Amino acid sequence: MLPFILFSTLLSPILTESEKQQWFCNSSDAIISYSYCDHLKFPISISSEPCIRLRGTNGFVHVEFIPRGNLKYLYFNLFISVNSIELPKRKEVLCHGHDDDYSFCRALKGETVNTSIPFSFEGILFPKGHYRCVAEAIAGDTEEKLFCLNFTIIHRRDVN
């Protein structure tokens, strides 16, 4: 009986289910997916129109979620790696509390946020490889973590 308990205890971390990838889009030059990177697993819906290509596309990323706190102040901590090389942490402030560019700024706790954010990769050349971006959304005066998402981008073609 002791070997069975020892064996099952040692292998349980190995046999647990890996973090489920949420499909985001699959284009001619990139596969993009995301998963949760914290235990909160906050319900969020992300899609793009058109599917993101890293070769000069532009469009909109659609985001829908219900914030657990007021969005008067909102910023993202971005941790990015390219082919396993870590880049410096980046802090991207979206909602300053005044003269904000985005309609969802000042949304209150419990209100549905449904927004479209424009993107463009015109003139940017991405080398092929494996990109990872962890995005932590931090909101409010108390700097509460709203959610954490781990984006994976596999760029299949070298455009240089």
Swiss-Prot record:
UniProt KW keywords: Disulfide bond, Glycoprotein, Immunity, Inflammatory response, Innate immunity, Secreted, Signal
- Annotated GO MF terms: lipopolysaccharide binding; lipopolysaccharide immune receptor activity; Toll-like receptor 4 binding
* Record keyword Glycoprotein present: yes
> Tissue-wise, where is it found?
Highly expressed in spleen, bone marrow, thymus, liver, kidney, ovary and decidua. Detected at lower levels in testis, small intestine and skin.
The UniProt entry lists the main location of this chain as secreted
Summarize the subunit comment: Heterogeneous homomer formed from homodimers; disulfide-linked. Belongs to the lipopolysaccharide (LPS) receptor, a multi-protein complex containing at least CD14, LY96 and TLR4. Binds to the extracellular domain of TLR4. Binds to the extracellular domain of TLR2. Ligand binding induces interaction with TLR4 and oligomerization of the complex.
Q: What is this protein called?
A: Lymphocyte antigen 96
The stretch of residues making up the signal peptide is 1-18
Locate the transmembrane regions by residue number: none
Query: What is the organism of origin for this protein?
Result: Mus musculus (Mouse)
SMART domains attached here?
A: ML (SM00737)
Localization recorded for this chain is: Secreted, Extracellular space; Secreted
Q: Where is this region: Interaction with lipopolysaccharide?
A: 119-123
**Function recorded in the entry:** Binds bacterial lipopolysaccharide (LPS). Cooperates with TLR4 in the innate immune response to bacterial lipopolysaccharide (LPS), and with TLR2 in the response to cell wall components from Gram-positive and Gram-negative bacteria. Enhances TLR4-dependent activation of NF-kappa-B. Cells expressing both LY96 and TLR4, but not TLR4 alone, respond to LPS.
Q: A GO CC term?
A: plasma membrane
The answer on whether this UniProt entry bears the keyword Cell membrane reads: no
